[in-house]
């Protein structure tokens, strides 16, 4: 069985993904701020470095998959936290364990966002993240940004993350490591429970083509099943994909975009 590392697997989508993988007999390592198998603040360079070092110590023979799921919404939290955790907390963790993935021909999956959130993304912010490696400098530039527009920076980090996957996947794939993104729809998690009123209004204004019983939001298991699959060897032909698991919302909003 495989070794699967998941960030942010204490609750929500991450916890459900971990549950599915464990039921299938895999070893799962949860990296989270609290309550994880490895406790680390992935919004800091020091926290990431510590987690990466521990993974190398525990699994010198390699790991089968890295699922970068940890993140924070844009509701009333510092902009610096949104950027450091959502973007650098994913990309730098993925880079930090690349050699472990390469040893086993593994895969990496990151959590992006669906079309509703991406519509709020600012291309200048996404470009800054994708094209400048200096995290400290970026945080300096956004230190005075009002947290009230955190949803814009949330969307921008997730857009940048999806673009990072597209840019990096050809090189990673040529070295035997697949890199993909999952773009969840509106899911019933603690993050969506704490949405700002304007965020919830925007979410509820778009009808979801696929109905999930009486529930207005998807169950985390819908996302977790897709995440567990795309991280597995059964998805060996999938690389560089941003997979929308949203009940058809992306198709509704972007019906003319075929790829």
Curated annotation (Swiss-Prot):
Keyword NAD: yes
Top EC group: oxidoreductase
Family statement: Belongs to the short-chain dehydrogenases/reductases (SDR) family.
Keyword Manganese listed: no
Record's catalysed reaction(s): lithocholate + NAD(+) = 3-oxo-5beta-cholan-24-oate + NADH + H(+); deoxycholate + NAD(+) = 12alpha-hydroxy-3-oxo-5beta-cholan-24-oate + NADH + H(+); cholate + NAD(+) = 7alpha,12alpha-dihydroxy-3-oxo-5beta-cholan-24-oate + NADH + H(+); chenodeoxycholate + NAD(+) = 3-oxochenodeoxycholate + NADH + H(+)
EC nos: 1.1.1.-, 1.1.1.52
Protein task: Involved in the modification of secondary bile acids into iso-bile acids (3beta-bile acids) via epimerization of the 3-OH group through a 3-oxo-intermediate. Catalyzes the oxidation of deoxycholate (DCA) and lithocholate (LCA) to yield 12-alpha-hydroxy-3-oxo-5-beta-cholan-24-oate (3-oxo-DCA) and 3-oxo-5-beta-cholan-24-oate (3-oxo-LCA), respectively. Is also able to catalyze the oxidation of cholate (CA) and chenodeoxycholate (CDCA) into 3-dehydrocholate (3-oxo-CA) and 7-alpha-hydroxy-3-oxo-5-beta-cholan-24-oate (3-oxo-CDCA), respectively. Can also catalyze the reverse reactions in vitro.
Name of this protein: 3alpha-hydroxysteroid dehydrogenase
Gene3D superfamilies: NAD(P)-binding Rossmann-like Domain
pH profile of the protein: Transformation of DCA is more efficient at pH 10 than pH 7.
Residues annotated for NAD(+) binding in this entry: 32, 154, 158
Active site as annotated: 154
Keywords on record: Lipid metabolism, NAD, Oxidoreductase, Steroid metabolism
């Amino acid at each position: 069985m495989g070794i699967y590392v998941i960030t942010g697997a204490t609750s929500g989508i991450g916890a459900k993904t971990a549950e599915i993988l464990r039921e299938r007999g895999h070893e799962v390592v949860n990296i989270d701020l609290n309550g994880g198998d490895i406790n680390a603040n992935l919004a800091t360079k020091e926290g990431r470095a510590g987690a990466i070092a521990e993974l190398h110590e525990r699994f010198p023979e390699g790991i089968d998959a890295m699922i970068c799921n940890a993140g924070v919404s844009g509701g009333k939290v510092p902009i610096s936290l949104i950027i450091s955790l959502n973007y650098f907390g994913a990309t730098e963790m993925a880079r930090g364990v690349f050699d472990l993935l390469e040893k086993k021909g593994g895969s990496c999956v990151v959590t992006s966002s669906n079309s509703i959130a991406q519509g709020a993304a600012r291309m200048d912010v996404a470009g800054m993240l994708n094209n400048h490696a200096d995290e400290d400098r970026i945080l300096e530039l956004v230190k005075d940004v009002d947290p009230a527009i955190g949803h814009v920076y949330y969307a921008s980090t997730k857009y940048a993350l999806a673009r990072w996957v597209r840019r990096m996947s050809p090189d990673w794939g040529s070295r035997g490591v697949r890199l993909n993104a999952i773009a969840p729809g509106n899911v019933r998690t603690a993050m969506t429970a704490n949405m700002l009123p304007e965020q919830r209004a925007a979410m509820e204004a778009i009808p979801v083509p696929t109905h999930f019983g009486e529930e207005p939001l998807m169950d985390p298991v819908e996302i977790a099943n897709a995440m567990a699959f795309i991280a597995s060897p059964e998805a060996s032909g999938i690389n560089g994909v941003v997979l929308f698991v949203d009940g058809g919302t992306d198709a509704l909003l972007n019906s003319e975009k075929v790829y």
